[in-house]
């Protein structure tokens, strides 16, 4: 069989990594080995942090709901308990948005929660 030098395939694979490493500092954007390590690390962090972002936003929503419910005389846990008892099915994302953008509407929801406790 004829000898295959793999020039095209290897260059394409290296260019793919170097394209992902574009904008990195120093050798990390120029040298294939350094770029490979940097890209691998960056992709691992991106994968991990897409999951961490969900946790962070949920805790932010809970903090905002807690602050708004305390302004209405309820703790967060009592507020959520009251909503569950009243069969109010508004998720934390929407509750946090209402707490920030419409405090009067949130106080009405808090009244519903307080009445059902």
UniProtKB/Swiss-Prot annotation:
The gene is rplT. SUPFAM superfamilies: Ribosomal protein L20 (SSF74731). It holds the Pfam family Ribosomal_L20. Coiled coil: none annotated. GO terms for cellular component: ribonucleoprotein complex; ribosome. GO terms for molecular function: rRNA binding; structural constituent of ribosome. The keyword rRNA-binding applies. Belongs to the bacterial ribosomal protein bL20 family. Signal peptide: none annotated. It comes from the Bacteria. Gene3D superfamilies: 6.10.160.10, Ribosomal protein L20. Binds directly to 23S ribosomal RNA and is necessary for the in vitro assembly process of the 50S ribosomal subunit. It is not involved in the protein synthesizing functions of that subunit. Keywords: Ribonucleoprotein, Ribosomal protein, RNA-binding, rRNA-binding. PROSITE patterns: RIBOSOMAL_L20 (PS00937). One of its GO terms (biological process) is translation. The lineage of its organism: Bacteria, Pseudomonadati, Thermodesulfobacteriota, Desulfuromonadia, Desulfuromonadales. This is Large ribosomal subunit protein bL20.
């Amino acid at each position: 069989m004829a000898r295959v030098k793999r020039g095209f395939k290897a260059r394409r694979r290296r260019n793919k990594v170097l394209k992902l490493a574009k904008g990195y500092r120093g050798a990390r954007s120029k040298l294939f080995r350094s770029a490979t390590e940097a890209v691998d690390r960056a992709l691992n962090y991106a994968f991990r942090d897409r999951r961490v972002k969900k946790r962070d936003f949920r805790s932010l929503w809970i903090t905002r709901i807690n602050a708004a419910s305390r302004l209405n005389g309820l703790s967060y846990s009592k507020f959520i308990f009251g909503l569950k008892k009243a069969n109010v099915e508004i998720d934390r994302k929407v509750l946090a948005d209402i707490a920030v953008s419409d405090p009067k509407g949130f106080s009405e929801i808090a009244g519903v929660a307080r009445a059902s406790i």
